[in-house]
Amino acid sequence: MYSYKYPRPMLTADCVVFGARRDGGYALLLVERGNDPFKGMWALPGGFMEMDETLEACARRELEEETGCAVQGPLEELGSFSAVDRDPRGRTVTVAFMAVVEEHPVAGGDDARQARWFPLDQLPPLAFDHKEIVAVALKRKFGAALPQSEAQ
């Protein structure tokens, strides 16, 4: 049996899902965390990758489990986020994915207390480093950064 002497970080996938609104604007899909760390705070849908799935499959699974949202089209890989202290549970690297869908009803499931669309100018404070991830997504998708008044 092969022995691997190097420590292994945890790997997660997070989803930045923008909802196209009827008024021509966009909203961001967030979940209220039901468990620690950051219990009760809002976060991007996402979670830990299982050994038998790809990162994109992980992103799709977590998104559907936590919000009921099943993205039919492509998920764009946004990038990896690997700050050493980004997760208090231990060394965790996330790969973020992005999609744009029509805004539709969502509901919290699995370890998410609730799921909700937030107008981009009314984002709550976000758990982990999700403010940074959202800022990268906004810049990539819309060419705009997150205004200072949003997402502490």
Q: Model-found features: residue ranges?
A:
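N-terminal strand-loop-strand
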Residues: M1-A43, E56
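Short acidic, hydrophobic short linear motifs in intrinsically disordered regions
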Residues: L146-Q152
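Unchanged
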Residues: M49-L146
